[in-house]
């Protein structure tokens, strides 16, 4: 840690920025060349080594062999597609389902413009972005759980 650039806390300009909640990006370890030349290659090589090592140590196949003539009773997508799958499943008009999925990134693109006057990077000082994130997370988890249930319980989860 001694090779990192320490902040000069006696500097009045830095102290004024820190008092306003700003200035934390003006000191620290520079990305070039430290991160890009030394840290990133170590992480990339370590990731490859772990992946290859695990593939060599445990070469077993994942799951059973596929049979193209035996269709499962209920076809479910991968777990990360559960919320969008459930959204398309419960909205009767498919165009509305696709538009509702397109509204998610469109809504996320508007958040920086709504909070462009806020100079803070702390999430607790950015209430709109934090609220959008928390509501989106809860709705995604709710829809993901509902995707594994029958269609009549997909939205209520059988609770209501």
Swiss-Prot record:
GO terms for cellular component: chloroplast thylakoid membrane; mitochondrion. It comes from the Eukaryota. Disulfide bonds: none annotated. Coiled coil: none annotated. Belongs to the cytochrome b family. PetD subfamily. Component of the cytochrome b6-f complex, which mediates electron transfer between photosystem II (PSII) and photosystem I (PSI), cyclic electron flow around PSI, and state transitions. This is Cytochrome b6-f complex subunit 4. It comes from Pyropia yezoensis (Susabi-nori). The lineage of its organism: Eukaryota, Rhodophyta, Bangiophyceae, Bangiales, Bangiaceae. The gene is petD.
